[in-house]
C-alpha cells in the first residue's frame, strides 16, 4: 500500500516525535511510504534570528499565509530543505529506515506555478492585490522519481519547495503539496499528522466526512485546519481512496489512523 504522510509543522517544532519514527520504521517494511514535512514556525524562528521580520497575509477566505519575498524564500529553503529535512532523515536513519530527503526543486519533483498577484485583506478589511512574491501552487509531480526511490526501498522525505516555470524556488503549502504527491503517485491514502486528533465541530471529533461535507464545513473551522481539510478534499477528488487527519503525538500514530482509530476520515464512502 502506498501512503503519503504529511508531518505537520506543529510536530516538527517540538522535534520529531519518537512514536512517529518508530511507527514509520514498523510500517516501512510492508508499505511504500512518502513523507512530506512542514515547519513554518521554525522558519519564523530562524528568520527572526537573522533579523528578517516575517509578514503574514490573510486571504478573503480567512486563510493566513506567509508573504514570501526573495530574502524570505532563501531562509525558507535553508530551514525546510536543510535543517528540518535532515533532522527527519537522521531520526529515520537511527531507527534503521532507508530515507532520502528531497526539496521539491530536486529533479523538478514539485512543479509549481508562481502567483503573480495575491488578493489579501488589509488592516481596514478591504480586498487589495499585492505582488505574489515567491509563492505558488503545485501543478505537477515527478512521480517517476519517487517510484524509483520506492522501488529501491527508500522512504522519500519531501520539503515543500516547488520549482516555477522560470526555475525559481516557490513556497508552497505543505498540506496541499502532500495532496498533490498523493494524487500524482496514485497513493491509496494520505495522512495529515498534526497536534490534535482530527477535525472538531461543535466540540466533538468528526469521524467521517464526504468531500462535499468537508467542503461545506470550511467556514466553521480555523485556518490551520482549513488547509488540511482543503488538501484532504483535493486528494480524494483526485482519486486517493481516503484522507486521514489525525494526531501525530500518540503511540503508533499512522497505524492508528489507518485503522480509523480516533481520527477524521474523508472519503467518498
What are these regions (language model features)?
Residues 1-64, 68-269:
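C-terminal catalytic "cap/lid" subdomain
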Amino acid at each position: 500500500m502506498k501512503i503519503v504522510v504529511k508531518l505537520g509543522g506543529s510536530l516538527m517544532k517540538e522535534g520529531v516525535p519518537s512514536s512517529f519514527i518508530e511507527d514509520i520504521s514498523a510500517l516501512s517494511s510492508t508499505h511504500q511510504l512518502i513523507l512530506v514535512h512542514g515547519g513554518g514556525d521554525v522558519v519564523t524562528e530562524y528568520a527572526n534570528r537573522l533579523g528578517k521580520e516575517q509578514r503574514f497575509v490573510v486571504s478573503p477566505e480567512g486563510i493566513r499565509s506567509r508573504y514570501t519575498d526573495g530574502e524570505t524564500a532563501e531562509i525558507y529553503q535553508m530551514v525546510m530543505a536543510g535543517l528540518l529535512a535532515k533532522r527527519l532523515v537522521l531520526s529515520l536513519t537511527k531507527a534503521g529506515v532507508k530515507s532520502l530527503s528531497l526539496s521539491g526543486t530536486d529533479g523538478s519533483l514539485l512543479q509549481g506555478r508562481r502567483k503573480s498577484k495575491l488578493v489579501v485583506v488589509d488592516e481596514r478589511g478591504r480586498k487589495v492585490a499585492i505582488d505574489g512574491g515567491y509563492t505558488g501552487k503545485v501543478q505537477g509531480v515527478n512521480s517517476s522519481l519517487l517510484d524509483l526511490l520506492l522501488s529501491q526501498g527508500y522512504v522519500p522525505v519531501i520539503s515543500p519547495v516547488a520549482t516555477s516555470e522560470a526555475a525559481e524556488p516557490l513556497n508552497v503549502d505543505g498540506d496541499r503539496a502532500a495532496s498533490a504527491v498523493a494524487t500524482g503517485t496514485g497513493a491509496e491514502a494520505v495522512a495529515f499528522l498534526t497536534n490534535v486528533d482530527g477535525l472538531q465541530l461543535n466540540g466533538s471529533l468528526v469521524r467521517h466526512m464526504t468531500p462535499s461535507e468537508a467542503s461545506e464545513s470550511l467556514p466553521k473551522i480555523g485556518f490551520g485546519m482549513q488547509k488540511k481539510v482543503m488538501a484532504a478534499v483535493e486528494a480524494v477528488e483526485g482519486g486517493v481512496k481516503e484522507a486521514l487527519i489525525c494526531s501525530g503525538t500518540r503511540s503508533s500514530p499512522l497505524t492508528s489512523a489507518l485503522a480509523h482509530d480516533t481520527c477524521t476520515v474523508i472519503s467518498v464512502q
